[in-house]
Amino acid sequence: MSKSENLYSAARELIPGGVNSPVRAFTGVGGTPLFIEKADGAWLYDVDGKAYIDYVGSWGPMVLGHNHPAIRNAVIEAAERGLSFGAPTEMEVKMAELVTSLVPTMDMVRMVNSGTEATMSAIRLARGFTGRDKIIKFEGCYHGHADCLLVKAGSGALTLGQPNSPGVPADFAKHTLTCVYNDLASVRAAFEQYPQEIACIIVEPVAGNMNCVLPLPEFLPGLRALCDEFGALLIIDEVMTGFRVALAGAQDYYGVVPDLTCLGKIIGGGMPVGAFGGRRDVMDALAPTGPVYQAGTLSGNPIAMAAGFACLNEVAQPGIHETLNKLTTRLAEGLREAAQEAGIPLVVNHVGGMFGIFFTDAGSVTCYQDVMACDVERFKRFFHLMLDEGVYLAPSAFEAGFMSVAHSMDDINNTIDAARRVFAKL
């Protein structure tokens, strides 16, 4: 047995499923998950000594690549002064100044410890501010594991939320309306059915948890208009897209102004950080200035703030996003060309430093139903053959891939060459 296999066997006796987050278990592709020893730049190294070009990037945070010296040094320096104080620090102020300067729609920001905390808190704030209970989310979009967000759609375009996980009471989920991503008619139907009850829409501007599905041109502006028409708040969940699709996020790239924004992943530079913020009048409703309660023992802790501050300063440097776009575009185009040469029907969506691979002859993938119609079995074979070639992709047909500026053009071309060999075997 390999060392990864031995560790996985031991882990399953002690940790549910052997992992601390389900997708890491390779359930979506089969086989034994890799146990990682270290990472540097664009590369992962497993406990068995094998090296991989990494397109997971810790599920998004590693836009600068692994083990970036500026982030590493910032963490070491901060740790020498203490790990956590439970009191305000100067770095929290500096971090808030930086985040609000980079994302102009955020007048104020509150730091938390994860993307789930950010979305959960933003929804509570929207409900408290509007005095309404219902929320709209979209089929196939994931906003963390808060109870009100673990719901799925039924057969219709609009359904009252039904729990998608045991342990979530139906009474919690009943206020969540699920609409169809990229379908404004389903959203209008929800508002017309509950015109005075909907507090907010929460949306991934690029749906990165059903692989990578881009918004149609009219979709995000249409959501803004509907929120304005019916007095609801628009929450854009930029946990995945923030600082990756563009410096000011996908909201800037697509030209839509939210009331609240949720951030995570890149904002922590690899440390556990989330944030939510937006309009001053809305944020003023948050405790201690307002009645909506939110708190956290480790929120804004000095180690995480130091890592995030160092990361965002690097991400804000000129040319970073141009490089990211160039690398991602080259990979997407190369994969399409290689698949076409092999007669493999393939769609590759991409924007900024995100991409998604879909085995389908549909020609385009724009919603959850399109994603579900793709050939998952072929993706499983593709994943394992690419892994054999030394390329680590997301171990699920429903997760986006992530580029970093640490990837070289040689890394990209080698990945395309590997895919060409793999396509010949599919």
UniProtKB/Swiss-Prot annotation:
Catalytic activity from the UniProt record: (S)-4-amino-5-oxopentanoate = 5-aminolevulinate
InterPro entries: 4pyrrol_synth_GluAld_NH2Trfase, Aminotrans_3, Aminotrans_3_PPA_site, PyrdxlP-dep_Trfase, PyrdxlP-dep_Trfase_major, PyrdxlP-dep_Trfase_small
Compartments reported by the entry: Cytoplasm
GO BP annotation list: protoporphyrinogen IX biosynthetic process
GO cellular component terms listed in the entry, alphabetical order: cytoplasm
Pathway connected to this protein: Porphyrin-containing compound metabolism; protoporphyrin-IX biosynthesis; 5-aminolevulinate from L-glutamyl-tRNA(Glu): step 2/2
N6-(pyridoxal phosphate)lysine modified-residue sites: K265
Enzyme Commission no: 5.4.3.8
Record-linked Pfam families: Aminotran_3
UniProt KW Isomerase keyword: yes
Keyword tags: Cytoplasm, Isomerase, Porphyrin biosynthesis, Pyridoxal phosphate
Keyword Isomerase: yes
GO molecular function: glutamate-1-semialdehyde 2,1-aminomutase activity; pyridoxal phosphate binding; transaminase activity
Names of required cofactors: pyridoxal 5'-phosphate
Enzyme class: isomerase
Domain of life: Bacteria
Oligomeric and partner information: Homodimer.
NCBIfam families listed in its UniProt record: hemL (TIGR00713), PRK00062.1 (NF000818)
Family assignment from sequence similarity: Belongs to the class-III pyridoxal-phosphate-dependent aminotransferase family. HemL subfamily.
Name of the featured protein: Glutamate-1-semialdehyde 2,1-aminomutase
Upper taxonomic lineage: Bacteria, Pseudomonadati, Pseudomonadota, Gammaproteobacteria, Enterobacterales
